[in-house]
Each structure stands twice: as C-alpha cells, then as structure tokens.
Amino acid sequence: MDLQAQLEELKTKTQEALKQLNGDHSKELQELRVAVLGKRGTLTELLKGLKDLSNDLRPVVGKQVNELRDFLTQAFEEQAKVVEAAKIQAKLDSESIDVTLPGRQMKQGYRHVLTQISEEIEDIFLGMGFQIVDGFEVEKDYYNFERMNLPKDHPARDMQDTFYITEDILLRTHTSPVQARTLDQHDFSKGPLKMISPGRVFRRDTDDATHSHQFHQIEGLVVGKSISMGDLKGTLEMIIKKMFGKERKIRLRPSYFPFTEPSVEVDVSCFKCGGKGCNVCKKTGWIEILGAGMVHPSVLEMSGVNAQEYSGFAFGLGQERIAMLRYGINDIRGFYQGDSRFSKQFK
C-alpha cells in the first residue's frame, strides 16, 4: 500500500475511533491522540516514508501529511470538548438536588442583652431631645481626669485604678471625656447642650461575679441657663419609670463625685418587693441605680463656659447593672463569654 493510501486509511480509522468516544472517555481520548499524533505515533511513522518518494511526489505527499495533521488535531480538540461536556453532565446527574426537599434551617443569632439595654436607653433619651455622642476609648489623661476636676495630685484619683498605655495616654475609666470634648465645641447661642455618651470603659478590677475590667456606661450631660437640681430629678424620674415601670419611685442621697457639686446617689424603689424589703434590695426597699449631680463650676470654666450664667447636671449609669437588676443575673461574666444559650434568654 502506497503512502497516500496509508494516510487516507489513518484518517478514516481515526475518525471512526473518535466517534466511539462520546461519553466520559477522557483517558481513552488522550491515549488515542498519543497513538496517532504522538512522537512515536502512526502519523510520525508514516512521515518517515517521505524520504523514499521521488522528488516530484515528495512535496505533494508532504502537503497531504500536513493537512492531515491539522485535520486530526482539530478533530481531537473538538472531541475533547464533547468528552468534557459529557463529564460535566455526568457529574451534574450524579449530584442532582431535589429542590422540593425542605431546607435545613439556619441557626438564629440573638441580639446581646447589653445591646438591647443600650438601644432602649438611647431611644428614651432621643425622645427627650438628647443627642448621642461617641468618643475615644483610648483617651488622654487630661480629658479623663483633669477636665473632670481631678488634677494629678487629687486624692480622688485613688478611687479608680487605671490602665495606662503611656504616662499621658490611658484606657478611659468613664465616658465623661466625651462630655468635656463636646462641651468645648458646643455653641450655646443655639440652645442648651443635652447629650448622652454611651460606650465601653475600663478599670483595673479583678474579674469576679460583680466586677469586670471592662463594662459599659451611659453618661448624660445637660448644660444651659437656669438648670436646677429639680430638672435633674425630673429627668431621672422619667428615665427610671420608662426603664422599670411607672410605679417606681426614686430617692436622692448625698454623695461625692469630683466633677459634680452637689453630688447624689440615686436609688430606685425595689421592683421585686415594691419597697417592702427582700433579698434583691437587701431588706431596705431601695436599690442603688446610678450616680448624678450638678456640674461642678470648675468643669464648666475649663470649657470656657461662664459658670455664673450657665449651670447643668450630669449622671452616669451602667448597662450591666440595669440588665442584672432587671433580669436577675447574678454573674457579670455571663455578658462577655459569648454563649448563645445566655443571649437566647433575652430574645
């Protein structure tokens, strides 16, 4: 059989072999390609016969060989696409999903109880015309202490153990620095300042059932003309009644805070026994809930506010304490352990 006839026969047999590889036969297709077009394949062996042809016939047959190589290369590429499509379809068929089956319910997350308490308190104050102001958790000693009427040699600094980063930079021990910064910027020609500053604060406490090295506070500040202790009492009564019920009463006890004068501790009538005395209120009928007072004139003066013309009141309450009292939680550490079973109770 001459070389041209062998080339034609190779073309015919290869086409027939390719037609048999319609399914997932990628391995067989590769083996056939190597057998026909590889370095030791049939076409390569036939090329060796060109040297035995006459000078007139060699170019003609050489062209035929090149055309056959191109034809077979394209045929293998097209068949490879067919085989790959068959492979994908077979995988889809084996991994088919019955869309009529019921889905698996995702586990539901829960808003943290402290988030709920914070948002509830913020909504109350927004309804009373207060603005919410955020501030820095890493604060300057100047704003955290000195602007709160606590100079470096003030003995009251011993009341708070502090996380210092440098000599003058610390983790804030209260959100009062936000009030000082806001007081600096407020334009009293546009009206009084009414604000709250919620956020995390940090103290060097040993963690136990009632203490934590970090906790949350919401501090409030109102400064304007003719602000009195009566305004403070009325504001606190409204907050307490909205938080703990309309039947709740408050009482003010004299206390001491460096940044307010006079200062008071605020108690709420026990919401468990109604003031009769129980284990929650320690048989007193009252529960300590927050601290407050009239803004110290020195604090106003340090912000450039004329203390003869303006006065104000400030207060601070802790979200953890409110949550513990409201829900009977006896260990503050439960707020920070990330246990969904704990959060689920307050959904």
From Swiss-Prot:
EC code: 6.1.1.20
Gene3D superfamilies per the record?
Bira Bifunctional Protein, Domain 2
| Record field: catalytic activity | tRNA(Phe) + L-phenylalanine + ATP = L-phenylalanyl-tRNA(Phe) + AMP + diphosphate + H(+)
Q: Which GO terms describe its biological process?
A: phenylalanyl-tRNA aminoacylation
Give the matching HAMAP family. Phe_tRNA_synth_alpha1
Q: How is the cofactor bound?
A: Binds 2 magnesium ions per tetramer.
CC terms in the record's Gene Ontology section: cytoplasm
**Assembly mode:** Tetramer of two alpha and two beta subunits.
What stretches pass through the bilayer? none
Is Cytoplasm given among the entry's keywords?
A: yes
What's in the keyword line of the UniProt record?
A: Aminoacyl-tRNA synthetase, ATP-binding, Cytoplasm, Ligase, Magnesium, Metal-binding, Nucleotide-binding, Protein biosynthesis
Q: Which InterPro entries match?
A: aa-tRNA-synth_II, aa-tRNA-synth_II/BPL/LPL, Phe-tRNA-synth_IIc_asu, Phe-tRNA_ligase_II_N, Phe_tRNA_ligase_alpha1_bac, Phenylalanyl-tRNA_Synthase, tRNA-bd_arm
Q: Which GO terms describe its molecular function?
A: ATP binding; catalytic activity, acting on a protein; magnesium ion binding; phenylalanine-tRNA ligase activity; transferase activity; tRNA binding
Location in the cell reads: Cytoplasm
Name the predominant localization: cytoplasm
SUPFAM superfamilies (UniProt xref): Class II aaRS and biotin synthetases, tRNA-binding arm
Protein name in the entry: Phenylalanine--tRNA ligase alpha subunit
According to its UniProt record, which cofactors does this protein need? Mg(2+)
